[in-house]
């Protein structure tokens, strides 16, 4: 007999449901799905109709490939003003957050992404105080930024409120970052927010975006990087998600080229392993503005050695050795982008 899974939102989300629908343009409803029976998914959220009970991630950004996880239970499906949102319980990676058919995080390996995109930039400068996060609606980057005791202010601008609410509901250990009193959440367009930010406001800007399609496309374009550079203090740093060297070398080359023209300090590409991302890895572009020299490859603010780690969730992935190793590129990538770094 086919097993059914029914989505029921907790009362905390139900209380805000009507207001959220009016102000953010999304609707949330209970969903039933015949997981074991392998029903086709007309909404395009990526549930495979070829292998019953499996989620398959298929995208034109990685043609000829499919990445699959076995589904135990569909926990949530909804559609916001911007994208389709799904959460399911997998057999081997815990709960999984999916946006427009693309895996954003799993409970098992989210640490490899969240810790690296945060600590690569913040451990490269002394005493960061003001940080802006663009995207990052799951709260994981906030959780990691909050480890740094020097931080006084954390702004986050996320375009999709459904991502925030769903993350708080289903991924509380990730979304715990929203509970930090230094955090100010703004629901809105990150591009517009940056344009309005006073010049030289931030020590670091972390861009936790999805792939350069849909609502995140602007976050990979030259005008956006110009806004980031303007919002940073002299010697300030940016770290942005920068795709996979196995799949998107053309995109990476464009990002490196744009950043070299805009940021007058250091420009480096780093990477980390994330098993549930296409090709099993993801890259980061790290840039600094003109001012005090930033050597991204050698951390000056080693968070893994500080006493504050005794009182919070231990680091699972990041350490100072991995920090330095993250900038080592395989030969084919070094030939393509290594010479373009500064």
From Swiss-Prot:
It comes from the Eukaryota. Residues 11-23 have a biased composition (Basic and acidic residues). Its EC number is 2.5.1.16. CDD domains: AdoMet_MTases. Keywords: Polyamine biosynthesis, Spermidine biosynthesis, Transferase. It catalyses: S-adenosyl 3-(methylsulfanyl)propylamine + putrescine = S-methyl-5'-thioadenosine + spermidine + H(+). PROSITE patterns: PABS_1, PABS_2. The active site is at residue 208. Pathway: Amine and polyamine biosynthesis; spermidine biosynthesis; spermidine from putrescine: step 1/1. Residues 52-289 form the PABS domain. Putrescine binds at residues 113, 208-211, 277. GO terms for biological process: spermidine biosynthetic process. The keyword Isomerase does not apply. The keyword Secreted does not apply. One of its GO terms (molecular function) is spermidine synthase activity. S-adenosyl 3-(methylsulfanyl)propylamine binds at residues 83, 114, 138, 158, 189-190, 208. Pfam families: Spermine_synt_N, Spermine_synth. Residues 1-46 are annotated as: Disordered. GO terms for cellular component: cytosol. Belongs to the spermidine/spermine synthase family. NCBIfam families: PRK00811.1, speE. This is Spermidine synthase 2. It comes from Pisum sativum (Garden pea). The lineage of its organism: Eukaryota, Viridiplantae, Streptophyta, Embryophyta, Tracheophyta.
